[in-house]
UniProtKB/Swiss-Prot annotation:
GO terms for cellular component: cytoplasm; ribonucleoprotein complex; ribosome. Keywords: Ribonucleoprotein, Ribosomal protein. HAMAP family: Ribosomal_bL36. Belongs to the bacterial ribosomal protein bL36 family. The keyword Ribosomal protein applies. GO terms for molecular function: structural constituent of ribosome. Disulfide bonds: none annotated. GO terms for biological process: translation. This is Large ribosomal subunit protein bL36. InterPro entries: Ribosomal_bL36 (IPR000473), Ribosomal_bL36_sp (IPR035977). It holds the Pfam family Ribosomal_L36. The keyword Ribosomal protein applies.
């Protein structure tokens, strides 16, 4: 899980979602692409 000021999809499988008021990227194909804003 990377914590970044700006989260962007890194591949076509990445999905931008919002959980508990935080913007997150989840990626089923490449778990390295997981990101959280903060």
């Amino acid at each position: 899980m990377k914590v970044r000021p700006s989260v962007k999809p890194m591949c076509e499988h990445c999905k931008v979602i919002k959980r508990h008021g935080r913007v997150m990227v989840i990626c089923p194909a490449n778990p390295k692409h997981k990101q959280r804003q903060g």
